[in-house]
Amino acid sequence: MPHVGNLLDDRNRDLIALRPEATAMEAAQAMADRRIGSIVVTDDDGRPLGIFTERDLMVRVIVAGRDARTTRLSDVMTAELFTAHPAEKAADVRRAMQERHIRHVPIVVDGRVIGMLSLRDVLRAVLADKTHEVQAIKAYIQGFEDEDSPSPSERERED
């Protein structure tokens, strides 16, 4: 089973983070420019304070009637932040993300964010691992089937 650290590549490590005083408009522009669905909100030392997602933008800014140009991230970010460590199993993180109904998880080491994974990243890895398991089991079973079936010379004798 892959670990979270195995899933981090250059794309996941090229983290974009904003300070809490940044505006929702700045976050929306950064997400649109990078084609990402969330931004980690950090302090000066890179420690995570929260996360701002497309859903936060929609529900807490637009639907709430706030002005994205003046609304600070600290006022609309999700402060209850679920994070993962590179040593955690991808399947465990997937389960936790599904239970919490979240699609993005910051990866944290020593209190600092080193990357971000999406539910899609995690599901791809879990699927690839399960596919590999199925192929291994299939090969194992076929090995037994080959042992049980008569060899070509035995088949000739049967005819």
Model-derived features: where do they sit?
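The conserved cystathionine-beta-synthase
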Residues: 17-35, 42, 83-101, 108
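Residue-level signal for alpha-helical context at structural boundaries
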Residues: 22-25, 45, 75-76, 111, ...
